[in-house]
Swiss-Prot record:
UniProt-recorded name of the protein: Probable pectate lyase 22
Positions annotated as active site in the UniProt record: R308
UniProt pathway: Glycan metabolism; pectin degradation; 2-dehydro-3-deoxy-D-gluconate from pectin: step 2/5
Cofactor: binding details: Binds 1 Ca(2+) ion. Required for its activity.
UniProt cross-references to InterPro entries, sorted A to Z: AmbAllergen, Pec_lyase, Pectin_lyas_fold, Pectin_lyase_fold/virulence, PEL
Enzyme class (EC, first level): lyase
Amino acid sequence: MFRPNSLLIPSNLSTTKSQRNTMLNSSYLSFALIFFCCILFSALASSLPVSDPELVVEEVHRKINESISRRKLGFFSCGSGNPIDDCWRCDKDWEKNRKRLADCGIGFGKNAIGGRDGEIYVVTDPGNDDPVNPRPGTLRYAVIQDEPLWIIFKRDMTIQLKEELIMNSFKTLDGRGASVHISGGPCITIQYVTNIIIHGLHIHDCKQGGNTYVRDSPEHYGYRTVSDGDGVSIFGGSHVWVDHCSLSNCNDGLIDAIRGSTAITISNNYLTHHNKVMLLGHSDTYEQDKNMQVTIAFNHFGEGLVQRMPRCRHGYFHVVNNDYTHWEMYAIGGSANPTINSQGNRFLAPDDSSSKEVTKHEDAPEDEWRNWNWRSEGDLLLNGAFFTYSGAGPAKSSSYSKASSLAARPSSHVGEITIASGALSCKRGSHC
């Protein structure tokens, strides 16, 4: 497995996971004010349809600015300016209110409710993975059920799956309160299903599977060809939210979304030690991906990454307030005329003089890609990093947003709002 060397970065931009966890123990606000904020965020989200990409961009901007404003006024002493986290993390009774998380989404995947309307299912058995006849108590048994389920884990566990974990619709995987690792085998597949939330998991060292039978519902199992070995594979899925996961070192992609997938938010994740990080769009000729809409927000792209953060095709992609501290080839790339709206990110280029460019326009001559709409607005470009604009470029344009005044949070604050990226260490009875 290819493991690129980590690059050195200034100490004020790089933190260890233990340092980041220590920095999280700040002051906290009362439950009542946070609950009020969550209601407000939910009302704002419900007023804007996912079908309008520009309005969703506007909504992300507005939520970030509202969170900042309240903090400046003293309302959010525990707030980070991260509207997702500020919606639920200040509640020390988070374990009793787990499903509140479903009302905290932003961006294109904001309507993903997962298993909010179902029962809580507790995974008690990390082993005994039978891909065709899973036992009650196992993760596979939970995810294939037809009814909505909010799936939690009884204790710390490492789950090594024998084949892909093929999820059914309306499921939440909630790792809070335990250290849950899915690793060493095939990992998560979201295929032709909807309303999935994946939160708080360590997903790493995922392998290929296939050439065997796998169950995907209580009534059906089918023959699977060889899988790619992604950490999270979204194949024709919709209303998907991947939040606060730690992902690394998988066979193909860490998170890939293809074949008409849409309405996706990828947020607050910590991604490390991988080559082809994130593919969004199946192929240059698969035009159904023109409807793809993905929000990539508040993630930390960390040590040992090479490329595809993300690599986009056809659709509309909002890359906002992420921290890019490492890449070897490039950070954001694409082909087949995707619209890429990069706002308020922090890009720290590697020392290699040949890899300073953030972007890579792929598989097209310049006279073609110069018409693709890619812009950088408010990004912080460090150590010689540069972003190659194209199409409408950095100018205010309806090609990107209808409300350019509601900008993303300043890139100088990215370190603060991404400091808790990855799977959190949540203890029952304490603020998460």
